[in-house]
C-alpha cells in the first residue's frame, strides 16, 4: 500500500514539473511574440504594413439586385435571376514551370486525364476536346501565362449542381483510394478539378418574352441598355455593398470585419401603367394585321383618357428582350414615340375641334365641294373622288372630304390653325418619360407660307408621333382636357413602401383646351364616320365607337413630292360614345399596296378589335352598337374608297 502511495506521489510530482516546464515555455513564447509585435510596430515601413494588411484583408463587392418591373396588375415583366459563370485557370492546370499546381509530373498528367473525363460529362462534349482547347489558350499573344478563361457563362443552378455532383464523385473516389492505401491516386482524384471555378452573377430575364419589348427595353447584369430599362436605370440598379474579410495563410476566410461592411441596397421595384391583358390584346391584333397586310412596321396604343395612363403600347415587329440580338437594331426603338410621320386625314378632328370652339363653323355649316375638284386660293388642285356637290361640316368629316377641310382651314387662317396644332400638343414633347421621344415636326408660325392652310387641314406638312395622336384623342374623349401620358404607376421607394409616380415626380400638368360641348359635337361626327362613313370596317358589334381614318402618301426622302404607292394607314378611335373609357390609335406603316392601304380597311379593324376586346375585359356593359347605312355599305365603301387619300 505504501509503495502504491509513493508511486502516485512521484507521478504527481512529475506532472507538476511537466506543467511548470510547459508554462515557462509558453510564457517565453508569448514574451517573444510580444517583442516581435513591438519590433514590427516600430520598424516596419508604411509600405510593409500595407503589404501585410493586403495579405490578410480581402475586400469583396456585395452586388445589389437589379429591381424588377411589373405591369399595373403586378405581373412580372422584367426580373433578375442568379446565374453561374464557369471559368478555368489554364496556367494552374498545366503549370508549365511546375510552381503552381499541387501535383507534378506523372501525377499531374494523370489528374488532367481525370479532369478531361469529368469535364466532358459536365460540358456534354467529347473527352478528347477539352484539354487541347484549353491548352491552346495557355498563353496570351505576348507570351504571358494566361490565368483565366471563360468556359460557360449565364448557366442556371442545375448546371452548377451537376458540376458539384461530378466533383463530389471524384472526392468519393479519392477517399476510397485512401482506404485502399493508394495515396497517390487519392491525390489525383482529389485535385482533378482544381483550377475550375465559378463566379456568381445575375442575368436579366423577361418572363413574358416579347411583351412590350420596345417599351421595356433590355439590360445586362449591370445596367439598362435600351427602353425603360435604360431610362429608369438609376431607380432599378440599386447600390452595391462591401465586405472586408480576414483570410489565413491558406486564403481561407476567417471572419468578416465590422469596419468597412456595408449591406447592398437593392434597386427600387417599378410598376408600369401597362395592363397585361390589354397589352397582349394589342400585340395580338397588331400581329394579325401584319400577317394580312405585310407592313414595314406598325404601332398600337391604348390609353385611359381620364388619367392619361398608357394601358398598351405595342410595336410590330416585336422585340424579345431575352434575345434582342436576334432583332435588327432598327426595330429596337419604340416607334410610338420615336418616329413622327405625316398623319393624313386622322388629323382632321383636331382641326375641326378648334374651328368649332372658335365658332368658325358649326356641324351644320354647308360648304360647296365642287363635285370633287377644287382649286384653293393658291391655285393648288384638291380632289375628292367621292365627287359630292356640297357637304355639311359633319359630312366633311364623315366622308373625309379634303376639299371641305381645305376651305375650313382657309377660313380659320394660319394663326388659328397653328394655335390648334399647338394646343393639342403637336410639335412638342408629351411629358411622358419614355426614352427617345420626338416632338414631331411643326414649323414655327413665322415660317408658314400660303398654302400651308391647305396641307395642314388634312394632315400633311406636319409630322406627329402615334403617342401625340393618342394624347390629343384623349382630349376629344374626356371633355377637352389634354393629359400628360403616364407609363409609370408606382415605385417601391423603400421596402414595402409604394409611392405613385405623381408623388415622386410631382403633379403632372393637364390643360383644358376645348369645352366639353365642343368635344361632344366632334364625337358625334366621329361616330357617324363609323356608321356611314370611311370607318365602317371598324364597326364594333358590341359598342358605339367614334373614330377617324387616315391614309397618307409617304414623302420622298430628300425630295419634294410623294410616293404614288407607298402609304401610312392610321385609325384613331374611342368608346363607348356616351362615356368613353378607352381610346386607341393604330398606325400601319407601308402596308403592301396590293393587299390594302386605306386607314379604314388596314388599321381600322385592328383598332376596333383592340377596343372591343379591351372594353369587354374591363367589363364595360355593351350597348347595341350602330347600324350601317345601306348607301355606304361595305361593298359600296370599297368602290368609293378606291383612289381616296384619307
Describe each region flagged by the PLM.
Residues 3-4, 13-47:
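Hydrophobic alpha-helical transmembrane signal-anchor segments
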Residues 47-62, 278-293:
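Short, basic/aromatic recognition patches
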Residues 2-3, 78, 247-261, 265-267, ...:
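Beta-lactam-recognizing serine transpeptidase/beta-lactamase-like catalytic domain environment
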Residues 84, 113-117, 121, 161-165, ...:
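Solvent-exposed, polar/charged alpha-helical surfaces in well-ordered, non-transmembrane soluble domains
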Residues 66-71, 75-79, 83-89, 148-152, ...:
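Soluble periplasmic/extracytoplasmic beta-strand elements of cell-envelope proteins
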Residues 78, 87-88, 92, 114-121, ...:
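Small/polar-residue-rich segments within soluble enzyme cores
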Residues 60-124:
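Juxtamembrane extramembrane loops of integral membrane proteins
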Residues 61-65, 240, 294-298, 368:
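Short, small/polar residue-rich loop motifs at catalytic or cofactor-binding pockets
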Amino acid at each position: 500500500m505504501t509503495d502504491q502511495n509513493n508511486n502516485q506521489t512521484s507521478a504527481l510530482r512529475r506532472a507538476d514539473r511537466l506543467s511548470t516546464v510547459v508554462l515557462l515555455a509558453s510564457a517565453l513564447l508569448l514574451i517573444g511574440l510580444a517583442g516581435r509585435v513591438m519590433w514590427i510596430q516600430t520598424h516596419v515601413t508604411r509600405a510593409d504594413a500595407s503589404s501585410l494588411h493586403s495579405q490578410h484583408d480581402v475586400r469583396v463587392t456585395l452586388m445589389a439586385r437589379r429591381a424588377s418591373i411589373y405591369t399595373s396588375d403586378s405581373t412580372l415583366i422584367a426580373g433578375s435571376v442568379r446565374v453561374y459563370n464557369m471559368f478555368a485557370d489554364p496556367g494552374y492546370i498545366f503549370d508549365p514551370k511546375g510552381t503552381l499546381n499541387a501535383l507534378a509530373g506523372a501525377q499531374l498528367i494523370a489528374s488532367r486525364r481525370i479532369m478531361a473525363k469529368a469535364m466532358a460529362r459536365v460540358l456534354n462534349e467529347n473527352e478528347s476536346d477539352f484539354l487541347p482547347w484549353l491548352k491552346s489558350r495557355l498563353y496570351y499573344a505576348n507570351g504571358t501565362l494566361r490565368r483565366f478563361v471563360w468556359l460557360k457563362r449565364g448557366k442556371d443552378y442545375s448546371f452548377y449542381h451537376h458540376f458539384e455532383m461530378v466533383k463530389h464523385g471524384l472526392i468519393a473516389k479519392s477517399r476510397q483510394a485512401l482506404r485502399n492505401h493508394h495515396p497517390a491516386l487519392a491525390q489525383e482524384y482529389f485535385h482533378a478539378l482544381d483550377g475550375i471555378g465559378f463566379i456568381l452573377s445575375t442575368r436579366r430575364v423577361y418572363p413574358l418574352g416579347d411583351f412590350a419589348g420596345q417599351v421595356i427595353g433590355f439590360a445586362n447584369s449591370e445596367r439598362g441598355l435600351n427602353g425603360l430599362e435604360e431610362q429608369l436605370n438609376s431607380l432599378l440598379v440599386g447600390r452595391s455593398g462591401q465586405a472586408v474579410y480576414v483570410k489565413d495563410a491558406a486564403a481561407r476566410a476567417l471572419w468578416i470585419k465590422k469596419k468597412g461592411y456595408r449591406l447592398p441596397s437593392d434597386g427600387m421595384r417599378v410598376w408600369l401603367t401597362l395592363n397585361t391583358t390589354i397589352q397582349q390584346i394589342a400585340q395580338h391584333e397588331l400581329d394579325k394585321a401584319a400577317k394580312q397586310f405585310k407592313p414595314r412596321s406598325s404601332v398600337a396604343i391604348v390609353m385611359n383618357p381620364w388619367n392619361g395612363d398608357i394601358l398598351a403600347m405595342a410595336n410590330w415587329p416585336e422585340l424579345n428582350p431575352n434575345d434582342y440580338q436576334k432583332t435588327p437594331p432598327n426595330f429596337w426603338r419604340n416607334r410610338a414615340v420615336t418616329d413622327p410621320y405625316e398623319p393624313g386625314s386622322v388629323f382632321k378632328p383636331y382641326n375641326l375641334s378648334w374651328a368649332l370652339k372658335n365658332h368658325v363653323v358649326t356641324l351644320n355649316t354647308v360648304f360647296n365641294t365642287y363635285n370633287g375638284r377644287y382649286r384653293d386660293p393658291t391655285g393648288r388642285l384638291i380632289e375628292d373622288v367621292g365627287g359630292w356637290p356640297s357637304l355639311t361640316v359633319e359630312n366633311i368629316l364623315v366622308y373625309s372630304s379634303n376639299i371641305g377641310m381645305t376651305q375650313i382651314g382657309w377660313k380659320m387662317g394660319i394663326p388659328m390653325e397653328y394655335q390648334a396644332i399647338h394646343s393639342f400638343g403637336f410639335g412638342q414633347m408629351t411629358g411622358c418619360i419614355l426614352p427617345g421621344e420626338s416632338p414631331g415636326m411643326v414649323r414655327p408660325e413665322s415660317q408658314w407660307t400660303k398654302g400651308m392652310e391647305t396641307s395642314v387641314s388634312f394632315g400633311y406638312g406636319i409630322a406627329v408621333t402615334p403617342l401625340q395622336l393618342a394624347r390629343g384623342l384623349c382630349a376629344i374623349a374626356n371633355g377637352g382636357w389634354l393629359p400628360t401620358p403616364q407609363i409609370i404607376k408606382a415605385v417601391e421607394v423603400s421596402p414595402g413602401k409604394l409611392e405613385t409616380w405623381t408623388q415622386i415626380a410631382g403633379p403632372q400638368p393637364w390643360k383644358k383646351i376645348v369645352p366639353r360641348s365642343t368635344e361632344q359635337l366632334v364625337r358625334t361626327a366621329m361616330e357617324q364616320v363609323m356608321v356611314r362613313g370611311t370607318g365602317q370596317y371598324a364597326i364594333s358589334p358590341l359598342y358605339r365607337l367614334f373614330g377617324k381614318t387616315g391614309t397618307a402618301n409617304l414623302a420622298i426622302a430628300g425630295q419634294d413630292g410623294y410616293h404614288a404607292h407607298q402609304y401610312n394607314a392610321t385609325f384613331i378611335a374611342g368608346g363607348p360614345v356616351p362615356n368613353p373609357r378607352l381610346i386607341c390609335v393604330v398606325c400601319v406603316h407601308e402596308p403592301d399596296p396590293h393587299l390594302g392601304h386605306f386607314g379604314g380597311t388596314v388599321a381600322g379593324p385592328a383598332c376596333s378589335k383592340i377596343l372591343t376586346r379591351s372594353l369587354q375585359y374591363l367589363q364595360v356593359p355593351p350597348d347595341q352598337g350602330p347600324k350601317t347605312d345601306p348607301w355606304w355599305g361595305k361593298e359600296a365603301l370599297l368602290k368609293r374608297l378606291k383612289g381616296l387619300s384619307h
